[in-house]
Regions:
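N-terminal auxiliary segments of SAM/dcSAM-dependent transferases
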Residues: 1-35
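Conserved alpha-helix/loop element of class I SAM-dependent methyltransferases that forms part
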Residues: 43-50, 61-79
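A short acidic, Gly/Pro-enriched loop at the edge of an enzyme's catalytic core
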Residues: 143-154
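A short glycine-rich, Lys/Arg-flanked "PGG" loop and its adjoining helix->strand segment in the class I
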Residues: 168-183
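Class I SAM-dependent methyltransferase SAM/SAH-binding core
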Residues: 82-84, 93-144
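Conserved Class I S-adenosyl-L-methionine
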Residues: 231-296
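Short, glycine-/aromatic-enriched active-site segment of Class I SAM-dependent methyltransferases
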Residues: 186-210
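Short alpha-helix
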Residues: 210-226
């Protein structure tokens, strides 16, 4: 049986023999695209979850919310505490943390468009009452924070540290603005093996970041900055899958991307996707670290 045979059938129901022949010939291809442990539809979201996950974008959104909730649980912020969100993105995690804990959050970002989106979250008609009194956003450079010493009880940085041209400076600034004993929760990539120059270039362009370093280099910089490492979690499986999904969605939404950003964006990005994907899959680690400022 060929694909042409399947297409020619139209709406005619297949015979058991034809179904068997289809799986004999194309079962391995289905396993490559659907999953190989059972060859049935997977439960990508818990039963009854609302809103339901209906496509890959929704699945990616769900994964991001799960990550945010895990970080909120890990930082364990009390209602009276004040957290600095270093590299706050579009504000979703800051708002989610404030809603769940009742704590105050100050977010900083170097992207003006993302800061505009942050403000929209605070003024949206469905924004929780009092949210704008507990959450604020401002333009700010992580390597030169515009805050007084010991201004915050805690800080977190979700996928921002990889962007920094001087990571040690960013770590020292985070320590400076924390009260004695304050905790800093952050994510960071690390280099696992030896990628090709093409793979390194693709990753650094896609992420707008300097080349990654081995994990041991990060540990050394944390010690130089003066932090005490409290816990390290290896989250590499999540980053590898994120890279895979990003590449799939890029191909799936090419038409939308071209319409919104132009053919030039595709021409720039197309040659990066394959080496970016292999870099994420084969050469990168992803860690979640909880560190603390020294006690007074």
């Amino acid at each position: 049986m060929t694909m042409d045979d399947l297409g020619a059938r139209g709406t005619t129901a297949p015979t058991p023999e034809e179904i068997g022949a289809m799986y004999d010939q194309f079962g391995e291809m289905l396993a490559m695209t659907l999953g190989s442990t059972a060859l049935h539809i997977g439960m990508y979201a818990p039963h009854g979850q609302h809103p339901p996950v209906a496509d890959l974008v929704a699945l990616a959104d769900l994964a991001q919310d799960r990550q945010t909730d895990f970080l909120v649980d890990t930082i364990d912020l009390a209602p009276h505490e004040h957290l600095l969100d270093i590299g706050c993105g579009t504000g979703g995690p800051a708002v989610r943390l404030a809603e769940r804990t009742g704590a105050r959050v100050t977010g900083i970002n170097v992207s003006k468009s993302q800061l505009a989106r942050c403000q929209e979250r605070l003024t949206a008609p469905n924004a929780p009452q009092g949210l704008a009194e507990r959450v604020n956003f401002a333009y700010g450079n992580a390597m030169r924070l515009d805050f007084a010493d010991h201004a915050f009880d805690a800080a977190w940085s979700i996928d921002c540290i990889p962007h920094l041209s001087d990571r040690l400076a960013g770590l020292r600034e985070a320590l400076r603005v924390l009260r004695p004993g304050g905790r800093f929760l952050f994510t960071e990539f690390a280099l696992r093996t030896s990628p090709s120059a093409e793979e390194v270039a693709a990753f650094t362009q896609m992420w707008s970041c300097p080349p990654l370093t081995p994990f041991a280099t990060l540990v050394g910089e944390l010690q130089q900055a003066g932090f005490h490492v409290e816990s390290v979690r290896d989250m590499t499986a999540n980053s590898a899958l994120c890279g895979e999904l990003m590449c799939v969605l890029y191909e799936d939404r090419r038409g939308e991307i071209e319409e919104r950003f132009g053919k030039e964006a595709l021409a720039h990005t197309d040659p990066l996707m394959a080496p970016y994907r292999s870099f994420c899959r084969d050469h990168m680690e992803y860690y979640l670290l909880m560190v603390r400022a020294p006690e007074a």
